[in-house]
Amino acid sequence: MVVERQRVKEQDKIQRRSNFDPVESNLTPEQVKLEASRCLHCKNPRCVQGCPVNIQIPEFIKALKEDNLEEAGNIIRQTSMLPSVCGRVCPQERQCEGNCILGIKGQAVAIGALERYVGDNTQAEKTEIKPTGKKVAIVGSGCAGITAAADLRKAGHEVVVFEALHKLGGVLRYGIPPFRLPRTILDREITNLKAMGVEFHTDVVVGKSITLKQLKDDGFDVIFICSGAGLPKMMHIKGENLNGVFSANEFLTRVNLMGAGRDANSITPLRIGKKVAVIGGGNVAMDAARTAVRVGFEEVSILYRRTEKELPARLEEIRHAKEEGVQFKFLHAPIEIFDKDGYVDGMKFEIMELGEPDASGRRRPVGTGKFVTEDVDTVIVALGTGPNPIIQKSAEAEGMEIITDAKGYISVDPEKRSTNIPCVFAGGDVAPVGASNAINAMGAGKKAAKAINEMLKV
């Protein structure tokens, strides 16, 4: 008998428009057993090759098939300390599941759903930690920082994490909405790190509150910079500075971190208009649009300069956005935002067509000379982010010039994540190697931790 791919239960698409509760539930134990039985246990598992942190996927699925849930958890956590997070936010269709043999002619094994189930229902094994006497400072508490902190602490080093915001988690906290990543899940992972002995300090902006040189003077043997990329990329068009224009980072931070628009006690203002245009087509654009629906905008549209085929967002996020009433308007390139008394009063777009492929492999949008206007009162720009140069500038002022590329990202050895400064490493969005997402940031954290451990061996 052929077993069909098991589906998680989802919250009603109308009901979820007005709450921030998780959209998806876990598979049931019975579904987990059925889904695990679908794995072919290939001799050369392509799924593992597609995983940036090399989780031994067939092995943990075999453990599930044999009703050994704890063993499945142990196998995953040998290489990933964040299974509950990755099971929810990783682009599995382009990585592990995208490489699954079953997916060639049918439906891939639901690896992400299985990983999430294991993460939610198991705890990390307690390991004996033998102190090495070495100290490591980690700048940033996002995916790369959390992952590196776990691996470095297991090795016995004293690990101190410095976070610029008042809450821990980085983009997992301020960027990804709770309907995708429940905060209880994130808090549990951080609590586990604290139990291991990792020390955290919030409201510390490295480069301003304290410098790299001061960290070294304070006795840190190594510094790992994983402060993210918090500077939004804007459109550079007329009207972009009007009231009612937000970067996606600002909009999501106000709602996710500060409670604006969803917490009556929030002191962070957020003017809720009627019609919002979200510019972009990635996961952040989907998060912003779906969040806008939930805080009360009457009409939410995503405008993208290519076609649906080229959307870089996860297929699941696109589907969920459509189900929740988000409109998609393709081949629209922003030209101007109209001004009325200092506020957004509509937007002008040029209609595009697709030309030859660009460096990304996607067909390049080309203007047609035809224009349309959209009646909107709010604009959210989700076109990506760049690195904040505050750490590099403060280091340079103290005689530690960190080499960066033309876009301002820290240049690193792709395997070790080492910089040109001795004992200073960098990873995640501040020094990206490959696509910018949670699992690649975790991979960077693991590579950095491995190189740091080798360097600190006595």
Predicted regions located by residue number:
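Iron-sulfur cluster-binding cysteine motifs and their immediate structural context
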Residues: 41-66, 85-118, 160, 164-167, ...
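Ferredoxin-type iron-sulfur electron-transfer modules in oxidoreductases and energy-metabolism complexes
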Residues: 16-35, 56-88, 105-129, 255-256
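A conserved FAD-binding loop/helix module that cradles the flavin
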Residues: 430-458
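Glycine-rich dinucleotide-binding loop and its adjacent helix/turn
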Residues: 115-129, 188-208, 232-295, 404-415
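FAD-site-proximal beta/loop scaffold in flavoenzymes
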Residues: 241-273, 357-434
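Rossmann-like dinucleotide-binding cores of NAD(P)H-dependent redox enzymes
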Residues: 161, 165-196, 200, 289-336
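N-terminal Rossmann-like FAD-binding beta1-loop-alpha1 element of flavoenzymes
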Residues: 135-160, 285-293
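Feature captures the FAD/FMN-dependent oxidoreductase FAD-binding
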Residues: 71, 130-131, 135-139, 187-237, ...
